């Protein structure tokens, strides 16, 4: 599984693609189909949102398809909205684990 992450604040050149561990049992796993890129993500990457500390994966919303987990059938299309990027990786990933309250 790959994710876009930054380890220091800065311009777009601080973004890198890295491998991350697979999600644990009991988590809803969503294969991302689209993730927003917006001014909020730019502010996070530049260090203007003090609550987000590196290393961090940007992305506060997106949509995808459930591929594993509890609560929804596999293949269900879902929209994900925050608090991604605050204490958990954002939506700029191939796969996102989502808490029950973070999905529609």
Residue locations for each model-derived region?
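Extreme N-terminal starter segment of soluble prokaryotic enzymes
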Residues: 1-2
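Glycine-rich beta-strand-centered segment in the early N-terminal region that forms part
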Residues: 21-36, 46-87
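Residue-level marker for the onset of beta-strands and adjacent loop->beta junctions
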Residues: 16-18, 52, 92
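Residue-level signal for short segments within beta-strands and strand-turn junctions
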Residues: 5-8, 46
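Short N-terminal binding/cap micro-motifs at the start of the first secondary-structure element
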Residues: 10-17, 39-41, 74
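NAD(P)H dinucleotide-binding glycine-rich loop of Rossmann-like/cofactor-binding domains
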Residues: 79-104
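Generic structural detector for well-ordered beta-strands
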Residues: 19-21, 97
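Conserved catalytic-core motifs of eukaryotic protein kinase domains, centered on the activation segment
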Residues: 42-44, 90-91
